[in-house]
Swiss-Prot record:
GO terms for molecular function: ribosome binding; rRNA binding; translation initiation factor activity. This is Translation initiation factor IF-1. One of the essential components for the initiation of protein synthesis. Stabilizes the binding of IF-2 and IF-3 on the 30S subunit to which N-formylmethionyl-tRNA(fMet) subsequently binds. Helps modulate mRNA selection, yielding the 30S pre-initiation complex (PIC). Upon addition of the 50S ribosomal subunit IF-1, IF-2 and IF-3 are released leaving the mature 70S translation initiation complex. Gene3D superfamilies: Nucleic acid-binding proteins (2.40.50.140). It is found in: Cytoplasm. Disulfide bonds: none annotated. Coiled coil: none annotated. HAMAP family: IF_1. PANTHER family: TRANSLATION INITIATION FACTOR IF-1, CHLOROPLASTIC. The gene is infA. One of its GO terms (cellular component) is cytosol. Its main location: cytoplasm. It holds the Pfam family eIF-1a. SMART domains: S1.
Amino acid sequence: MAKDAIKMTGKVIKAYNTDEYDVELENGIVVRAHISGKIRVHHITILRGDTVDVELSTYDLTKGRIVYRHR
């Protein structure tokens, strides 16, 4: 994303398919997020309950992209 993207940490609460998830952010807001290309290429599995880093666009704060899965 652009330099002005907002990076936040959250927890996956629901998985829709292999690359769409509902993530509850630290501040309690739930956003729909998809996985980034690097996570898809390296076949990193994201499950319900995982802690992830999400980048949010400043234009639409209801959608984001999962850029990192914490261990």
